[in-house]
Amino acid sequence: EHYAFVKRHPYQFWMMILEDDCPIGTFYLQKDNSIGLNILEPSQHLVSEVLRYIKENFKPFKEIKSKVPPYFYVNVPYENEKLNELLLDSEAMPIQISYKF
């Protein structure tokens, strides 16, 4: 199922997060330097480790004005208070809140 999903969504990089050989989440990087972070039960340690791994193993794509920023960023649903808190505690800096109408 995951293989088919990844084939349908050609991310720049996609990885399953394992704990004791059991999947507990995923993360992916896209060509616009966005990071998708999907963790079943996020913790400060786990979020920090994933962000550290990304920073140590990847570089953001070159900036394209108004399309691709020169840094990585994570979009988090507004109602996901826990992940928002964990990212702030990991020294991630909030840059925007988006609204749909």
Regions found by a protein language model. Give the residues of each.
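Conserved, charge-rich beta-strand/loop surface module that forms ligand/interface-binding patches
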Residues: 5, 23, 77
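Conserved catalytic-core motifs of GNAT/GCN5-like acyltransferases
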Residues: 93-101
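Short glycine-/small-residue motifs
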Residues: 25-26, 32
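Conserved acyl-CoA
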Residues: 49-71, 88-94
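A short, internal acetyl-CoA/4′-phosphopantetheine-binding micro-motif in the GNAT/acyltransferase core
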Residues: 18, 32-57, 77
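Conserved beta-strand-loop-alpha-helix junction that forms the acyl-donor binding cleft
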Residues: 66-84, 101
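Active-site rim helix/loop that mediates acceptor-substrate recognition in acyltransferases
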Residues: 1-12
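Conserved beta-hairpin
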Residues: 12-25
